[in-house]
């Protein structure tokens, strides 16, 4: 895992966009993002048991696996959105980037590779993309039935209860 401030330079979203300013895991924790390196699946199983994740599946994001819909899917994943549930991803193979909003609404880019696990809290604005190799195999973990429902960022979404709870827990409490 490598986290840093996104450079905001226009261009291919799959490039690193590394500003050279690093972000450490302790900052990620303050915005509710949990990171773990899990070299063995047993560590993922332990975390799943401890956090009550009952279901899982795997997804391969690549042109070979997804065919003609690959580019559209990657663009869709890169639209800024939130979920009303935690988003848990364990990288089985390949690499990708999660971008998450900071306390000041700036992008923090998190590069994940094989063995990296990330938990994004419900209500955090984020987006995802593969890197320039266009391949990632990820395990998705779920507390209940598998679902992935993105709510794209819009002004009215700030009234969403999951967003409000996130802001109260991770943004407002740290600036008071």
Curated annotation (Swiss-Prot):
Gene Ontology molecular function, alphabetical: acireductone dioxygenase (Ni2+-requiring) activity; acireductone dioxygenase [iron(II)-requiring] activity; iron ion binding; nickel cation binding
Species of the source: Ajellomyces capsulatus (strain G186AR / H82 / ATCC MYA-2454 / RMSCC 2432) (Darling's disease fungus)
Superkingdom: Eukaryota
A GO biological process held by the record: L-methionine salvage from methylthioadenosine
Cofactors named for this entry: Fe(2+); Ni(2+)
Pathway where this protein functions: Amino-acid biosynthesis; L-methionine biosynthesis via salvage pathway; L-methionine from S-methyl-5-thio-alpha-D-ribose 1-phosphate: step 5/6
UniProt entry tagged with the keyword Lyase: no
Compartments, record wording: Cytoplasm; Nucleus
Entry's EC annotation: 1.13.11.54, 1.13.11.53
Protein name, per record: Acireductone dioxygenase
Catalysed reactions listed for this entry: 1,2-dihydroxy-5-(methylsulfanyl)pent-1-en-3-one + O2 = 4-methylsulfanyl-2-oxobutanoate + formate + 2 H(+); 1,2-dihydroxy-5-(methylsulfanyl)pent-1-en-3-one + O2 = 3-(methylsulfanyl)propanoate + CO + formate + 2 H(+)
One GO cellular component, as annotated: cytoplasm
The keyword Oxidoreductase is assigned to this record: yes
């Amino acid at each position: 895992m490598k986290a840093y401030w996104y450079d905001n330079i226009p261009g291919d979203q799959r490039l690193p966009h590394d500003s050279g300013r690093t972000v450490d895991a302790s900052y990620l924790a303050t915005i509710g993002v949990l990171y773990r390196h899990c070299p063995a699946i047993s560590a993922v199983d332990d975390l799943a048991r401890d956090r009550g994740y009952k279901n899982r599946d795997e997804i391969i994001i690549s042109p070979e696996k997804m065919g003609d819909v690959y580019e559209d899917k990657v663009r869709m994943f890169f639209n800024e959105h939130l979920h009303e549930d935690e988003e848990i991803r364990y990288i089985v193979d390949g690499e990708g980037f999660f971008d998450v909003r900071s306390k000041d609404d700036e992008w923090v880019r998190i590069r994940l590779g094989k063995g990296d696990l990330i938990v994004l809290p419900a209500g955090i604005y984020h987006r995802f993309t593969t890197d320039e190799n266009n391949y990632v195999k990820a395990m998705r973990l779920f507390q209940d039935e598998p679902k992935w429902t993105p709510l794209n960022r819009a002004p009215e979404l700030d009234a969403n209860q999951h967003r409000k709870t996130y802001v109260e827990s991770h943004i407002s409490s740290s600036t008071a």
